[in-house]
Curated annotation (Swiss-Prot):
Full protein name: Small ribosomal subunit protein uS2
Gene Ontology biological process: translation
Gene: rpsB
Keywords, sorted A to Z: Ribonucleoprotein, Ribosomal protein
Region described as Disordered: 256-291
Disulfide bonds: none
Record bears the keyword Repeat: no
Family annotation (InterPro entries): Ribosomal_uS2, Ribosomal_uS2_bac/mit/plastid, Ribosomal_uS2_CS, Ribosomal_uS2_flav_dom_sf
GO terms of molecular function: structural constituent of ribosome
GO terms under cellular component: cytosolic small ribosomal subunit
Family: Belongs to the universal ribosomal protein uS2 family.
CDD domains in the cross-refs: RPS2
Residue spans of biased composition, Low complexity class: 261-291
């Protein structure tokens, strides 16, 4: 079954690029034609690139990786938060803070501070403080939640990033490339394809387009999580022997290894028949005795 259909792409306006005067010549190979001063993206290529990106994301997550969803423009914020939350992945929908990836150790300390403030609020620690102190803590917590709330459970840099609009998120893309983190992103006609490892040519300005492609990536994450869970169950379900089988006795195991011989049977074996000559002598003796 196809990840997404041509009809879905058309209905979401994925094929609409930017005006012809606002384009990156490197995107020429992804452009189908020009109509009314707007470039039309080749959706046949988009379909193949979607499959490629889908497989990469699925395999990454299946092997224990995480994908960071990034989209701070208004058209992408809702889809980024909704789809990332659906599959339990971190996301950034507000302003990207410089160093979120390259200086993650410092960011992680701020995440710990956010959790500390949440703990104070839950345990009622603010009640023993003055109103001014309570206000300061409340504002600090709100600010941290707004900027770092989407990555609050992220304990290390992600295995890959999904980006809506690489031009707007150029700082995030630059940090990912600096750390060697694969970038999966929508490539509009004004973007630089050299910055992206797994491009998906398409419209990054329309709400429906960004939502559709973000959902596709989230579906890939979901498939990867299912594959990971299946592999874990398979590993746990490998018994050394079948549940209903009795274990082999030690002498049986020795026979399998080619050591020793089987022990004598417990039942008494019948006596061997005497040789013909001995039998004849016994008969003569018996006759003599009788006489």
């Amino acid at each position: 079954m196809a990840v997404v259909t041509m009809k879905q792409l058309l209905e979401s306006g994925v094929h609409f690029g930017h005006q012809t005067k606002r384009w990156n010549p490197k995107m020429k190979r992804y452009i189908f034609t020009e109509r009314n001063g707007i470039y039309i993206i080749d959706l046949q290529q988009t379909l193949s690139y979607i499959d490629r990106a889908y497989d990469f994301v699925k395999e990454t997550v299946a092997h224990g990786g995480t994908v960071l969803f990034i989209g701070t423009k208004k058209q992408a914020q809702e889809a980024i938060e909704e789809q990332a939350a659906r599959v339990g992945m971190p996301y950034v929908k507000e302003r990207w803070l410089g160093g979120m990836l390259t200086n993650f150790s410092t960011v992680y300390k701020r995440l710990q501070r956010l959790k500390e403030l949440e703990e104070i609020e839950v345990t009622g620690g603010t009640e023993v403080r003055t109103k001014k102190e309570q206000l300061v803590l409340t504002r600090e917590k709100a600010k941290l939640e707004r900027t770092l709330g989407g990555i609050r459970d992220m304990s290390r840099v992600p295995s890959a990033v999904w980006v809506v609009d690489t031009k707007k998120e150029h700082i995030a893309v630059g940090e990912a490339r600096k750390l060697g983190i694969p970038v999966v992103a929508i490539l509009d006609t004004n973007c630089d394809p050299d910055e992206v490892d797994y491009p998906i040519p398409g419209n990054d300005d329309a709400i429906r387009s960004a939502a559709l492609l973000t959902r596709v990536v989230a579906d890939a994450v979901a498939d990867g999580l299912m594959a990971r869970a299946g592999a874990s169950k398979a590993a746990d379900a490998k018994p050394e022997q079948s549940a209903g089988e009795e274990p082999l006795a030690e002498w049986e195991q020795a026979l399998l290894r080619g050591e020793g011989t089987a022990p004598a049977a417990s039942e008494e074996q019948p006596a061997e028949e005497p040789a013909p000559a001995a039998a004849e002598a016994q008969t003569d003796a018996a006759v003599g005795t009788a006489v």
